[in-house]
Amino acid sequence: MQTWSDVLGQEKKQAYFQETMDFVRREREAGKIVYPPAADVFNAFKYTEFADVKVVILGQDPYHGPNQAHGLCFSVLPGVAVPPSLVNIYKELHRDIPGFEIPSHGYLLSWAQQGVLLLNTVLTVEAGKAHSHASSGWEHFTDRVIAALNEHREGLVFLLWGNHAQKKGQYIDRQRHHVLMAPHPSPLSAHRGFLGCGHFSQTNQFLTDADKQPINWQIAPIA
């Protein structure tokens, strides 16, 4: 059974990856606040092993406010206000999935544990500065992640919301995988087709058709 180490081990030895890690370390050492904390940068891979991935949701870069980002796209830690994009994701789930109750928090760990890879395409950001690390090499790394999933797995469901994610997904083999596209759930664009897209029920239909366990999208209350 292949692991992330098997498919990305060589990638992490590449010069560009070392340069990205050096850049982020220097930013932190210079006193800049970088999100998420160093221990959380690779959480998407920690919580969803390569062989367990069923669904891929692509984000852009991490939330850049205090205490928000923790390495899973769109997710925030318990106790942090649910960000606007995730509010819209919950609205669509409530519309799309019978019985879905809108949670009071935005902690999406249970999705990751069921095989939903919550992957930002840029894995770090400077506090208060959206896209500040966009050209630091992360994009190349996450391209390789998507390429590895495309090549070594079959029947994955990719949810590509917004132009950035759709551009990243242009090399996914549509014969091997399912690709669902919609506008970004941000308040700026959700009304253009994200709300009403039905991606969550469609995802579960694809999984069920392939004799895979569907995702339980309901987020349980924090005890």
UniProtKB/Swiss-Prot annotation:
Gene field: ung
Localization annotation: Cytoplasm
Keywords of this entry: Cytoplasm, DNA damage, DNA repair, Hydrolase
GO cellular component: cytoplasm
Known function: Excises uracil residues from the DNA which can arise as a result of misincorporation of dUMP residues by DNA polymerase or due to deamination of cytosine.
Name of protein: Uracil-DNA glycosylase
Pfam families tied to this protein: UDG (PF03167)
Annotated EC: 3.2.2.27
PROSITE patterns the UniProt entry points to: U_DNA_GLYCOSYLASE
MF GO annotations: uracil DNA N-glycosylase activity
Active site (record annotation): 61
Record bears the keyword DNA damage: yes
SUPFAM superfamilies in alphabetical order: Uracil-DNA glycosylase-like
Example GO biological process: base-excision repair, AP site formation via deaminated base removal
NCBIfam families, A to Z: PRK05254.1-1 (NF003588), PRK05254.1-2 (NF003589), PRK05254.1-4 (NF003591), PRK05254.1-5 (NF003592), ung (TIGR00628)
The organism of origin for this protein: Tolumonas auensis (strain DSM 9187 / NBRC 110442 / TA 4)
Catalytic activity annotation: Hydrolyzes single-stranded DNA or mismatched double-stranded DNA and polynucleotides, releasing free uracil
HAMAP family per record: UDG
Signal sequence annotation: none
Annotated family: Belongs to the uracil-DNA glycosylase (UDG) superfamily. UNG family.
PANTHER family: URACIL-DNA GLYCOSYLASE (PTHR11264:SF0)
Xref: InterPro entries: UDG_fam1, Ura-DNA_Glyclase_AS, Uracil-DNA_glycosylase-like, Uracil-DNA_glycosylase-like_sf
